Design a protein with these regions (language model features):
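Short acidic-glycine-tyrosine-enriched beta hairpin
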Residues: 67-82
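A cytosolic small-molecule/anion-sensing beta-strand core signal
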Residues: 57-58, 73-74, 92
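A short, N-terminal "cap"/entry segment at the start of jelly-roll beta-barrel domains
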Residues: 1-29, 112-116
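Ligand-binding loop in jelly-roll beta-barrel domains
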Residues: 82-106
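Conserved short histidine dyad/triad with adjacent acidic residue
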Residues: 18, 31-48
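Short, conserved beta-strand element in jelly-roll/cupin
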Residues: 36-38, 48-62
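Short beta-strand His + acidic residue motifs that chelate non-heme Fe in jelly-roll/DSBH
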Residues: 43-45, 63-64, 80, 85-91
Length: 116
């Protein structure tokens, strides 16, 4: 069929050691990735080669963009243009929905997590 259904809030597998990323959905135009962050976990500053969307499913983060911190809480959604430096610090256990362009690589996100 032309429909897919997934849940961002089921089968949560948080890790105290590192952030957990998982591609939950891939469409003809996007990749939907779930990022699980424990309170205090940091995703170091990085850039995306294509625009991204960050949707706060649960929790809250300090989202740094070019040196300015934006507080994002449950339900918030932001867009970010390509090549803008940004970082994330979890202020509580957090579920993030990251929407990537189909042209972007999920492996890139995994590398950022591994290096954070």
């Amino acid at each position: 069929t032309g429909m897919q259904k997934v849940s961002f809030t089921e089968n949560l597998d948080f890790s105290d050691k590192k952030m957990v990323t998982q591609i939950l959905l891939e469409t003809s135009f996007s990749k939907e990735i779930r990022i699980l962050l424990r309170k205090g976990q940091l995703m170091k500053e990085h850039k995306a080669p294509f625009p991204i969307i960050v949707h706060m499913v649960e929790g809250n983060i300090d989202f740094g963009v070019e040196g300015t911190v934006h507080v994002l809480k449950q339900g918030d959604m932001i867009t970010l243009a390509a090549n803008i430096p940004h970082d994330l610090l979890a202020k509580s256990d957090t579920i993030v929905r990251l929407t990537l362009s189909k042209l972007d690589a999920a492996e890139r996100v995994e590398k950022v997590v591994a290096n954070s």
